[in-house]
Amino acid sequence: MKKLLSILAVFGVSAVGTTSVVACNKTESNNLSRVKTIAAPATVAASTPKAVTKPEIKTALEANVLKAVQGVVKTATAADFQFEVYKNSKGTALETIDLEAGKVEVYLQITPAKDKTVVIGETRYIKVTLPKHGEVTKVDIKDVTVTEQTVGIKASTPKAVKKDELNAVNTYATLAKAVLDAIQNIAPNAGASDFEITNNGAEGDYEAAKEVEVTVKAKNDSANISGQFKFKAKVTATAPTE
């Protein structure tokens, strides 16, 4: 009996040990270590571009840092965390930088605000390249993703929808909002006027939902974004009610 208990004890310790290892390797969903990138601001407002201060840098970065944190905890607010700006990935203190001469790389670290538990842990030192004074950095939207959208349009004959009727997909309210929200996650300064939405829907029967490909492309004259991305939408047509 003692021998059996000894064997069980050994297995018990082993099982607990294994469980502990798994638990230690698991990253909590609200851990700031999940934040891997922070978008650069389009511009940095500074009273003296040759000696941009840390407070001016932080002001330019605030919106993008909040977006990055909300990518981990959607309900997080600016009061739930704090961040610091450094010269390098070793945490060397920063006082001023020269954005008159050109772009400058800085490093950010985000930690929870004192006595707050909405987020935990901390980020590594995340590199952000600040734009030269007077230049505006466009954000490439090629990696933006939008989940498949469900779209309902009106057509005079749902079994024979015309191309111009399919243009309603591009301005469908929930689809357009999903696109804008997704873009602003990486380019907070972007607006609806910075891009155009098109789709490849072919004329035909849309009484039953049919999949179309939607393309979102930055306008050439946009000061905030560049590039394009695509996603799917399921489109259904119904006749207008009299």
UniProtKB/Swiss-Prot annotation:
<feature type="lipid moiety-binding region" description="S-diacylglycerol cysteine">
    <location>
        <position position="24"/>
    </location>
</feature>
<keyword id="KW-1003">Cell membrane</keyword>
<dbReference type="InterPro" id="IPR054816">
    <property type="entry name" value="Lipoprotein_mollicutes-type_CS"/>
</dbReference>
<keyword id="KW-0449">Lipoprotein</keyword>
<comment type="function">
    <text>Major membrane protein of spiroplasma.</text>
</comment>
<keyword id="KW-0472">Membrane</keyword>
<keyword id="KW-0732">Signal</keyword>
<dbReference type="Pfam" id="PF05215">
    <property type="entry name" value="Spiralin"/>
</dbReference>
<dbReference type="GO" id="GO:0005886">
    <property type="term" value="C:plasma membrane"/>
</dbReference>
<comment type="similarity">
    <text>Belongs to the spiralin family.</text>
</comment>
<feature type="lipid moiety-binding region" description="N-palmitoyl cysteine">
    <location>
        <position position="24"/>
    </location>
</feature>
<keyword id="KW-0564">Palmitate</keyword>
<protein>
    <recommendedName>
        <fullName>Spiralin</fullName>
    </recommendedName>
</protein>
<feature type="signal peptide">
    <location>
        <begin position="1"/>
        <end position="23"/>
    </location>
</feature>
<dbReference type="InterPro" id="IPR007880">
    <property type="entry name" value="Spiralin"/>
</dbReference>
<comment type="subunit">
    <text>Seems to occur as dimer, tetramers, and large oligomers of identical chains.</text>
</comment>
